[in-house]
Amino acid sequence: MIAVDGPSGSGKSSASKGVARELGLRYLDTGAMYRALTWWFMTENVDPADTDLIAARAAEPSVEVSADPGNPWTRVDGTDVSSEIRTQEVSARVSAVARVPAVREHLIARQRAIIAAARPGVVAEGRDIGTVVAPAAQLKVFLTADPGARARRRAAELSADAGETEAAQARRDRLDAAQSEMAADALLLDATDLTLDEVIEKITRLARERGAGLFIPEGAELVALPGQGQEDKGSWAWAGDQSS
């Protein structure tokens, strides 16, 4: 597998999807899972400061994320929320939800099961993917960029003002500091002056050199998770102890 880590706005998602398409691999956006849960708590009017309630209800919603890098989507209880989870409101709250230990324990277990089930391999991206979720990944890349470049990318994604986005991003970096540690065996890639195609090419070349992503780590437990139709090339679900 290939693990792509890095701060918000560094281009993790776009690069990971591109690499997965180039190599014919599955794709896992771990951040979308945290965002989906955050969005659901917002619709339930749960105070992000109420960590006990968040911990108690973390397994309630059914959340699915697409495994197809060419058709990424996120669903909560069967409803597509791919756009809703990318708002500034969700971005402002997701760090608080992600810091709740019960939430992290629940989602990390799901993410590891998804990675173990992925065939022929997976490009997984998100905070602490290479240090906590998948420390045995064959290739780990820590993607970064200067604050201005990251803010511009995030602003384009959220259709927001770059100046406001940079301030919000700095705040989130402080909140996410514990999950932003670079793995000791990761390769640092500064994308500040690189195009998306150049980033994809560099990671793809490294993966081919190492043979990363073309097999599942030895000893990994296979967990059967149902797909959602040929057009989606499979999907991954987590909902309490059930797949849906």
Language-model regions: role of each:
Residues 76-82, 149-152, 159-160, 179-244:
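NTP-dependent small-molecule kinase module
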Residues 82-157:
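ATP-dependent NMP and nucleoside kinases share a basic, alpha-helical "lid"
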Residues 7:
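P-loop (Walker A) phosphate-binding loop of NTP-binding proteins
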Residues 15:
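Hydrophobic positions on the alpha1 helix immediately C-terminal to the Walker A/P-loop
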Residues 4:
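Hydrophobic anchor at the beta1->P-loop junction of P-loop NTPases
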Residues 12:
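Conserved lysine of the Walker
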Residues 66, 111-119, 129-136, 160-202:
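Small-molecule kinase domains that catalyze NTP-dependent phosphoryl transfer to phosphate-bearing small molecules
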Residues 21-86:
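N-terminal phosphate/diphosphate-binding loop that engages ATP/GTP or pyrophosphate donors
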